[in-house]
Amino acid sequence: HKREADFCSKGNLTNPEISPVEHYPPTNEIKEEATSWEEGNQSDYSINSLTEQIQGPYTPTPIMEYNHLIMQDNKYDVNACNSPLQETDVTKHALHKRDIDRRQRTQTQLKYDHRTNTGDKPLSCSECGKCFSTYHVLARHQKTH
């Protein structure tokens, strides 16, 4: 570090141990290329074909196909009603659908929800006596015996 400090303190910014860097005259190639890009000389076709070569043509995945909300013409569209929606309408539609789903729930589902909310566990294991609120949890427990 002493030698480096000597170079800096003397105002000598060159190091004799390092070979001099070759300097090339500045070129306008990069600037010209950037200018032609900004001017829009690049065709949309070449950009799109490059994208397709990299990513391939767009094909929806099975998850996208069954997604409740899909994009069409840059607007949300709900499969059930096929109407273009604004972002606020998407939220309203989702809330409305949730309310309908709640009304359509079966008595059994409501009974299980009530048990969960109250902590009621009327089902018990015949082997150990441990209590459960749903049949499927009891059945899973009984497999451990």
UniProtKB/Swiss-Prot annotation:
Keywords, in A-Z order: DNA-binding, Metal-binding, Nucleus, Transcription, Transcription regulation, Zinc, Zinc-finger
Zinc finger (C2H2-type): 123-145
Region (Disordered) location: 1-25
Disulfide bonds: none
GO molecular function, one term: DNA binding
Domain of life, source organism: Eukaryota
Keyword Nucleus: yes
GO cellular component: nucleus
Compartment list: Nucleus
InterPro entries: Znf_C2H2_sf, Znf_C2H2_type
Keyword Nucleus: yes
Job description of the protein: May be involved in transcriptional regulation.
Family: Belongs to the krueppel C2H2-type zinc-finger protein family.
Annotated protein name in UniProt: Oocyte zinc finger protein XlCOF8.4I
Species classification: Eukaryota, Metazoa, Chordata, Craniata, Vertebrata
